[in-house]
From Swiss-Prot:
GO terms for biological process: fatty acid beta-oxidation. It comes from Vibrio cholerae serotype O1 (strain ATCC 39315 / El Tor Inaba N16961). GO terms for molecular function: 3-hydroxybutyryl-CoA epimerase activity; enoyl-CoA hydratase activity; long-chain-3-hydroxyacyl-CoA dehydrogenase activity; NAD+ binding. It is found in: Cytoplasm. The gene is fadJ. This is Fatty acid oxidation complex subunit alpha.
C-alpha cells in the first residue's frame, strides 16, 4: 500500500491482518473525511480475503498517540445542517463496516484515544490499551458543544451500561487505562512493550470469534432495560444536567435525548438520530464559540510570547510557603516534572507547603492514580528551608510573598545575591507594577511577572507580564515553563491590574452597586450563574477574600482613575471581620460542611433593605457591560496582544461563559452597534461609568468586528 496513506494494511504469516494508522506529516493521528476513499480500499481488500483472515489488529505507528479524535477543522467547512449530517453519517457508515467484518477486530491502543478515535475502537470487537500515563480514553465532544457523532452515543451504553456511559459522555472526562478496564471500556491494559503481542493473543484466545453481546450487571438490567428504570435514570440525569448547565449548553440535553432514543428504538434508528442531532449542534452559536476556544488554545501552544529560544529549566525555587507558593510548587513538580526548592521565613511555612503537596499527591494515591512509591518519588522532588541553600542551582525563582513593594524588591536583591546571574526572577504579584519591583535590580532583564490564580492547581490561566527591559529569552522561558505546568499563558503589558483583574474590577464594582441598590444577594449571584459564570460575583468576593479586594481596588483607582471607584463597602465589612470564607463569614455564613447561606445580618450592617427590582437579564447586563468596555480599552492600550488573548484570559482567568466564546467574541455576536446602544442606555440610567470607550464607538461606526 502507498506509504503516503494514513491507513496501511498488511498481513502476517499466521493470517492476521494489521491496519496501521499514521497520518502523514502530523504529530497526532486525527480522522478526516478525506480518508474515506482509503478506508473503502482497505475494506475491499479485507472482504476480498475474508476467508483467509483470522482477525484484524488496528494500531498506531505514532510513538505516543492512537487517534486524538476527528479533525475539528472539518466542521468549519460545513455551511449547513445537511452538510454536517452527511459528515456524521459518513463516519458512522465507516465504523459500521468495521463492526460488520466477518472476523474479530481488536484495537491496540497506546496514547490518547479520544472522540472519533474511541468511536472507532468501540466499533471493534475487543480493545487492549497500554497502562502508560499517556494513554487516555474518552468522548470529549461535549466540551466542543457537540455529541459523539460516529456511533459513540449508541455503542458505549450497550458496552458498559447506561449509567457509566452517561457519566462519560455528559462530562467528556478522560479515563486512565485501569479505570477504562474496570468500567469495561477495554478488555485488558498491559505494558507498552507487549501491546501488539497481547492484542494478537486475545484474538487467538477468543477462538477467532466475533464478540458476543455484553452481559450487563443485574442492577444495570433492572434500571436501564425497563421503561420505568430508564425513565428514572433519564429524569434524574436531565435534572442534574439542568442544575449544572442552567440550560446554556444544548449539547447536554441532546446527548440525553439521543441515547434514550437509541435504547428505545434500536441501534439503527439511534444512529440516524445521532447524526441528525450532531449536525444541528455543529451549527449552534454555542458550539461555534466552544470550537473557537479549542482552536485558540491549540494556536497558543505554539506561541512562546517572544521571538527567542527558551532557556532550559532544570530546577525552580519558590519564595513563600503559603497557599500560592504551595500551589506553584505543586504544579511545577506534578506537571512540569521539575524539582522545587521552597524558602519561607519560618519553618512552619515550608512545612505547610510540603504538607499541602503531600495531601494533593495522597488524594491521587487514594484514587489509584499514583502508587505509594510514585507519591514518595514526587515528594522527593520537593525540599525547603529558611535560607537560600540550593537556590544557586535554580534556573527560575518564583516569588509568592505578601503584596508589599519593599518586600518584593528585597526578594529581588536576595535572589540576585544568592542565585546564578542567569536566574530568572518571576514575581507572582496580582496588582503591583513589575517595573517598580524591578526598579532596583542589577539584572532587570531577568525579571518578569508571572501571575497565577488561586487555587493554582485548579485555575488554568497564568498572566506573563514583561516590563520594558525584560529580555525575550526570559519571556519565552517562563511561557514555556507555565505551559509545562499545565497552564494557558497570555502575555500582557505591565500596568495596574494587568488584564484579568482590570476587567474583573468594573464587573465586581457594578455588582456592588446593584447590591447597594437593594437587590438580594442570592438573586444577584443567581442572575450571573444563569448567565453562565461558574460563581456569582458576591460568592466570588467571599472566596477571594474581602481583604484582597480592599487592597487591589485603591491601586486601580490610583493608577487608572475614578471609573474604578466602587461603593464604599470594604471598610464596613472588614471592621466586622467579614473577610469571606477564610474568616467564616462574609456575605454568606460558613459553618462546617453545612450549605452556605446568605448572612442576613450583612444587610443591616450595610444599611440595606433587600428588595428585588431588576430581572435576571438586567442584573447580568449591568455587571457585564463595564467588563466588556474595559476589555476593549485593554486591547486598544496594548495590555493584551489580541482579541484571542483577551477571550482566553477572561474564560480561563475568571470563568467568563465559555459557550459565549469570551468578551470579544460575545460582542461580535451581539454586534458592536447593539453593544454601544446598550451602554448608552445604561449611561442615561446609571451614569458615566457605562459610557462606551472610543475604541468601541469607532469600530461600531465603521461596522467592524474584533474577529474576521
Amino acid at each position: 500500500m502507498d506509504n503516503n496513506n494514513a491507513f496501511q494494511l498488511s498481513f502476517d504469516e499466521q493470517h492476521y491482518a494489521w491496519l496501521a494508522i499514521d497520518v502523514p506529516g502530523e504529530k497526532m493521528n486525527t480522522l478526516q473525511a478525506a480518508f474515506a476513499e482509503e478506508m473503502q480500499a482497505v475494506f475491499a481488500t479485507l472482504n476480498e480475503k475474508r476467508g483467509q483472515i483470522k482477525g484484524l489488529i488496528i494500531h498506531s505507528l505514532k510513538p505516543d498517540n492512537f487517534i486524538a479524535g476527528a479533525d475539528v477543522r472539518m466542521l468549519e467547512a460545513c455551511q449547513s445542517v445537511h452538510e454536517a449530517q452527511a459528515l456524521a453519517s459518513q463516519g458512522q457508515q465507516m465504523f459500521q463496516q468495521l463492526a460488520d467484518l466477518p472476523f474479530p477486530v481488536v484495537a491496540a491502543i497506546h496514547g490518547p484515544c479520544l472522540g472519533g478515535g474511541l468511536e472507532l475502537a468501540l466499533a471493534c470487537d475487543y480493545r487492549v490499551c497500554t497502562e502508560d500515563e499517556v494513554t487516555r480514553l474518552g468522548l470529549p465532544e461535549v466540551m466542543l458543544g457537540l455529541l459523539p457523532g460516529s456511533g459513540g452515543t449508541q455503542r458505549l451504553p450497550r458496552l458498559i451500561g447506561l449509567l457509566p456511559a452517561l457519566d462519560l459522555i455528559l462530562t467528556g472526562k478522560q479515563l486512565r487505562a485501569k479505570k477504562a478496564k474496570k468500567l469495561g471500556v477495554v478488555d485488558a491494559c498491559v505494558p507498552h512493550s507487549v501491546l501488539l503481542d497481547v492484542a494478537k493473543r486475545l484474538l487467538e484466545e477468543k477462538g477467532h470469534k466475533k464478540r458476543a453481546q455484553v452481559t450487563l450487571p443485574i442492577k444495570e438490567k433492572l434500571l436501564a432495560n425497563t421503561d420505568l428504570g430508564r425513565k428514572l435514570i433519564f429524569d434524574q440525569a436531565a435534572k442534574k444536567t439542568q442544575q449544572k448547565t442552567r440550560g446554556n449548553y444544548p449539547a447536554a440535553q441532546a446527548i440525553l435525548e439521543v441515547i434514550q432514543y437509541g435504547l428505545e428504538k434500536g441501534m439503527h434508528a439511534g444512529l440516524e438520530y445521532e447524526a441528525k442531532r450532531f449536525a444541528e449542534l455543529v451549527m449552534t452559536r454555542e458550539s461555534k464559540a466552544l470550537r473557537s476556544i479549542f482552536f485558540a488554545t491549540t494556536e497558543m501552544k505554539k506561541d512562546l510570547g517572544a521571538d527567542a529560544k527558551p532557556a532550559p529549566v532544570a530546577a525552580v525555587g519558590v519564595l513563600g510557603g503559603g497557599l500560592m507558593g504551595a500551589g506553584i510548587s505543586h504544579v511545577t513538580v506534578a506537571k512540569a516534572k521539575t524539582s522545587v526548592r521552597i524558602k519561607d521565613v519560618a519553618n512552619d511555612g515550608v512545612l505547610n507547603a510540603l504538607n499541602y503537596n503531600y495531601k494533593l499527591f495522597d488524594k491521587q494515591r487514594q484514587r489509584k492514580i499514583l502508587t505509594k512509591a510514585q507519591l514518595q518519588a514526587q515528594m522527593s522532588q520537593l525540599s525547603g528551608g529558611t535560607g537560600f541553600v540550593g537556590f544557586d542551582r535554580c534556573d527560575v525563582v518564583i516569588e509568592a510573598v505578601f503584596e508589599d513593594l519593599k518586600l518584593k524588591q528585597q526578594m529581588v536583591a536576595d535572589i540576585e545575591a544568592n542565585a546564578k546571574p542567569t536566574t530568572i526572577f518571576a514575581t507572582n504579584t496580582s496588582s503591583l507594577p513589575i517595573h517598580q519591583i524591578a526598579s532596583q535590580a542589577q539584572r532587570p532583564q531577568n525579571i518578569v511577572g508571572l501571575h497565577y490564580f488561586s487555587p493554582v492547581e485548579k485555575m488554568p490561566l497564568v498572566e506573563v507580564i514583561p516590563h520594558a527591559t525584560t529580555s525575550d529569552e526570559t519571556i519565552a522561558t517562563v511561557v514555556t515553563l507555565a505551559r509545562k505546568q499545565g497552564k494557558t499563558p497570555i502575555v500582557v503589558k505591565d500596568c495596574a491590574g494587568f488584564y484579568v483583574n482590570r476587567i474583573l474590577a468594573p464587573y465586581m464594582n457594578e455588582a456592588a452597586q446593584v447590591l447597594m441598590a437593594g437587590e438580594p444577594i442570592e438573586k444577584l449571584d443567581a442572575a450571573l450563574l444563569d448567565f453562565g459564570f461558574p460563581v456569582g460575583p458576591i460568592t466570588l468576593l467571599d472566596e477571594v477574600g474581602v481583604d484582597i479586594g480592599a487592597k487591589i481596588m485603591p491601586i486601580l483607582v490610583k493608577e487608572l482613575g475614578p471609573r474604578f471607584q466602587g461603593p464604599d463597602v470594604f471598610d464596613v465589612l472588614l471592621k466586622d471581620n467579614r473577610k469571606g470564607r477564610k474568616s467564616g463569614k462574609g456575605f454568606y455564613t460558613y459553618k462546617g460542611s453545612k450549605k452556605k447561606e446568605v448572612d442576613k445580618s450583612v444587610y443591616k450592617l450595610l444599611k440595606l433593605t433587600p428588595e428585588s427590582k431588576l430581572n435576571d437579564k438586567e442584573i447580568a447586563m449591568r455587571c457585564l457591560l463595564p467588563m466588556l468596555n474595559e476589555a476593549v480599552r485593554c486591547l486598544d492600550e496594548g495590555i493584551i496582544r489580541s482579541a484571542r488573548d483577551g477571550d482566553m484570559g477572561a474564560i480561563f482567568g475568571i470563568g467568563f461563559p465559555p459557550f459565549l466564546g469570551g468578551p470579544f467574541r460575545y460582542m461580535d455576536t451581539l454586534g458592536l452597534t447593539k453593544v454601544v446602544e446598550m451602554m448608552n442606555q445604561h449611561t442615561e440610567k446609571y451614569g458615566e461609568r457605562f459610557a462606551p470607550c472610543d475604541g468601541l464607538l469607532t469600530r461600531a461606526g465603521l461596522g467592524e468586528k474584533f474577529y474576521p
